[in-house]
Amino acid sequence: MRGHDVLPRQHRALYARCSVQVTAHLLARVAQLRIFGDDAGKMNRSLLDTGGAALAISQFTLYGDARGQRRPSFVQAAPPELGKNLYEEFVRVLEDFGVTVATGVFQAHMSVDLTNEGPVTILLDSENTF
């Protein structure tokens, strides 16, 4: 099935900084982002347009900071309990938009196989306006 591989990262201060409206806006973007080809091959179709799904795999390592050191620091990542709550909310809201979501197991070591059409990588961040 075609879809998005979504790697949500959970910041330790996300609840304090990120409103429900911002989170909903980002997830609407995930569902509505037109990055799948239309009949002419132009990026013009979204997950909702194609009936695609999302694979949501929690990725605290995206907060790994290796500046000036040989081992990354993960102090900006949410602690496990908060991270799990944020991840579950992320999945629930995305499903509320009508997207089928497959999930990984939170805090588990997983082997994930995917075929990437692209290369296309898009960053959506509630901290930055692009």
Please provide the spans of the model-predicted regions:
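Compact, glycine-rich, soluble single-domain proteins
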Residues: R9-G51, T61-R92, D96-F97, A102
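Flexible glycine-/small-residue-rich
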Residues: L14, S58-Q59, L114-N116, L124-S126
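Residue-level signal for inorganic ion chemistry
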Residues: L26, I57, V120
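A short, glycine/Asx- and small/polar-enriched loop/turn
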Residues: G52, L114-P119
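Short, low-complexity, polybasic intrinsically disordered segments
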Residues: F74-A77, E117-F130
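Beta-rich nucleic-acid/ligand-interaction surfaces
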Residues: A108-D113
